[in-house]
Amino acid sequence: MTNSKGRSITDKTSGGPSNGGGFVDWTLRLNTIQSDKFLNLLLSMVPVIYQKNQEDRHKKANGIWQDGLSTAVQTFSNRSEQHMEYHSFSEQSFHANNGHASSSCSQKYDDYANYNYCDGRETSETTAMLQDEDVSSDGDEDAIVEVTPKLPKESSGIMALQILVPFLLAGFGTVSAGMVLDIVQHWEVFRKVTEVFILVPALLGLKGNLEMTLASRLSTAVNIGKMDSPIEKWNLIIGNLALKQVQATVVGFLAAVAAIILGWIPEGKYYLDHSILLCSSSVATAFIASLLQGIIMVGVIVGSKKTGINPDNVATPIAASFGDLITLAILAWISQGLYSCLETYYYISPLVGVFFLALTPIWIIIAAKHPATRTVLHSGWEPVITAMVISSIGGLILDTTVSDPNLVGIVVYTPVINGIGGNLVAIQASRISTYLHLHSIPGELPDEPKGCYYPFRTFFGPGVNNKSAQVLLLLVIPGHLIFLYTIHLMKSGHTSLTIIFIVVYLFAAVLQVFTLLWIADWMVHHFWRKGKDPDSFSIPYLTALGDLLGTALLALSFHFLWLIGDRDGDVGD
């Protein structure tokens, strides 16, 4: 075979007997094909994912990662060796069967979390989402360099403006959820089956476990160019939506089990019909709400990409904008409907639960067919389930607090403080994750000061992540003031807006977000150093901690206000 540069390659394939049983000599001449295009075609058939050597790490010049060679030029044979080393696929199967043999990447990647993006071969999410490739020719040799995508530079003002609108939208969504919860707390199912209150933070926390994780992961994929191809984009979307339905169903069921146990421990009473109602309500709510929010989230990500807006700034807050309201409304409606059927149509409640649980194998099959989500079906449950348990503890605090008639005013503010804190910390975690994907490799941190992650390091410094932490913290007080007065103008809640109430509430909100941003700085870098994708691991923990911190600080605030005499005025009644 002769290419356009005069190189001759003859491919001899042994075949059956022909003219006396010799070999068949296949010689192809491709004089019309340019060598660099032909090489580009070959390389595009096999995605390249590889790890830098120790001495090659962090060598970067003008946005181009160097491979540690004396020149930027690599021959095709050298590149093939890298393919063989890091993909370990069968060459015979690849050529003879016109497909990829089942294989895995280097063992070094086995601990990297969750997803693989390389045509069905097992890899990690973090490694697969590294640099895109750029193939060029110097006119004499075929040179291959890898170009690192860069985020557009953002000033603090531009960043604040991009965050402000979705932040306010998300805030009004949580305010609406708080007002709905303030109303439905008087419904019969909430009064007779108080364990439903334990479900509230756990199910609302699904937006942190699933929706915000999906938003952050797809935002990172957009920023590093992994959604430029339509096929790759829809593989990511369909696989992630199917996976999310599996997780929502399982987490919804486990949240109900946790609510049953946590509700049984204080009083020692157990009711089978209440347990079935909790399981059915939780599973149905998680499934329906997750599906609706997932579709909305995909639209936001794709729309952000087309309009040139950084999805890291808008995707996670919009993921939560109506998430709380949708989830809470569905939970209240389904649980009240099933409760009204307990005496006359007792079989409806278990049938509802069984129906949604029976759909789980279908979603598992769909998710397993997409390489981007196959691995997480086995290894991605730890953060989701742990976050659910943390949120359920916050629900127990809420259930205990609302049992006191003097502290019922906490209900309307719980979704607000929890939602705002979770939204802001999810934005920061998503931005740090994108920064790490663009400036370092999994398991290695970029050139930053070593040592403990103390608050001064998080909020003060020249880095872009320091700047975003400052902007997010500054949004807390004006944002909460807007939401407090919105609740007041809507005549909702059971608490008068006194000066001391506003001061105590804002102190709790600022302390919550300050703590979460500090923890996020450490946690995202920690998971990256461990080779785990922070988009999938950190956000569930952070939003769950936001629920726990928000509920606990709010409960302490209301206890403090009661002790000093600033008590409820039954405004909402």
From Swiss-Prot:
Keywords: Cell membrane, Ion transport, Magnesium, Membrane, Phosphoprotein, Repeat, Transmembrane, Transmembrane helix, Transport. Its main location: membrane. Residues 1-162, 217-245, 304-313, 369-376, 428-469, 520-543 are extracellular. It is a multi-pass membrane protein. One of its GO terms (biological process) is manganese ion transport. It is found in: Cell membrane. InterPro entries: SLC41_membr_dom, SLC41_membr_dom_sf, SLC41A1-3. Residues 184-195, 267-282, 335-347, 398-406, 491-498, 565-573 are cytoplasmic. One of its GO terms (cellular component) is plasma membrane. GO terms for molecular function: inorganic cation transmembrane transporter activity; monoatomic cation transmembrane transporter activity. Gene3D superfamilies: SLC41 divalent cation transporters, integral membrane domain. It comes from the Eukaryota. The modification Phosphoserine is found at S136, S137. It catalyses: Mg(2+)(in) = Mg(2+)(out); Mn(2+)(in) = Mn(2+)(out); Co(2+)(in) = Co(2+)(out); Ni(2+)(in) = Ni(2+)(out). The chain crosses the membrane at residues 163-183, 196-216, 246-266, 283-303, 314-334, 348-368, 377-397, 407-427, 470-490, 499-519, 544-564. Belongs to the SLC41A transporter family. Acts as a plasma-membrane magnesium transporter. Can also mediate the transport of other divalent metal cations in an order of Ba(2+) > Ni(2+) > Co(2+) > Fe(2+) > Mn(2+). This is Solute carrier family 41 member 2.
